[in-house]
């Protein structure tokens, strides 16, 4: 099991994600196939001809919905309890979700974050782009700059 945690030093403000899994609802469609929705992320909707295809499409729909939260500077709801069906979010995306939520809690602007990190604002813009590959060390630097600590463990 891989665990990702973004903790705020001195506070009990912790985000612990063990395999960030978002529950999905698969509904059979009269014409055939399945309609997919996420109870925690209502914007993420998709469908597939088969159950397997629907679940494959679900991850892309979820990440696309996350992108809207990033663009709008809104916190991303964390996953609720998982039932029968779920989608595992890649750790690279999960770490950015936690990073965005903690950044928004900090009330800093991206310019202030860039200044604290000693980088240009364009670099911070790239960091907050889900489709841009960001090194985990960079996520750790963001965490530090906003008064948090990124902790990874393998159990």
UniProtKB/Swiss-Prot annotation:
Residue stretches making up the HTH cro/C1-type domain: 99-153
Family matches, as PROSITE patterns: HTH_CROC1
Record Gene3D superfamilies: 3.30.160.250, lambda repressor-like DNA-binding domains
Entry keyword set: DNA-binding, Repressor, Stress response, Toxin-antitoxin system, Transcription, Transcription regulation
Domain of life: Bacteria
Subunit structure: Probably forms a complex with the probable mRNA interferase HicA1 (its cognate toxin); when complexed with HicA 1 inhibits the toxin activity.
Family: Belongs to the HicB antitoxin family.
The protein's role, per its UniProt record: Antitoxin component of a type II toxin-antitoxin (TA) system. Functions as an mRNA interferase antitoxin preventing effects of the HicA 1 toxin.
Protein name: Antitoxin HicB 1
Lineage summary: Bacteria, Pseudomonadati, Pseudomonadota, Gammaproteobacteria, Enterobacterales
Primary gene name: hicB1
């Amino acid at each position: 099991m891989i665990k990702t945690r973004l903790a705020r030093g001195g506070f009990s403000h912790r985000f612990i994600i063990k395999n960030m899994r978002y529950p999905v609802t698969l509904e059979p469609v009269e014409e055939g196939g399945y309609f997919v929705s996420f109870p925690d992320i209502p914007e993420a909707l998709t469908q597939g001809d088969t159950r397997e295809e629907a679940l494959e499409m679900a991850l892309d729909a979820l990440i696309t919905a996350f992108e809207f939260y990033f663009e709008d500077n809104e916190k991303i709801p964390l996953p609720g309890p998982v039932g029968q069906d779920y989608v595992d979010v890649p750790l690279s995306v999960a770490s950015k979700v936690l990073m965005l939520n903690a950044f928004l809690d900090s009330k800093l602007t991206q310019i202030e974050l860039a200044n604290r990190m000693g980088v240009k604002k364009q670099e911070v813009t790239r960091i907050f782009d889900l489709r841009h590959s960001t090194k985990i060390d960079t996520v750790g630097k963001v965490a530090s700059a906003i008064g948090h600590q990124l902790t990874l463990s393998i159990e």
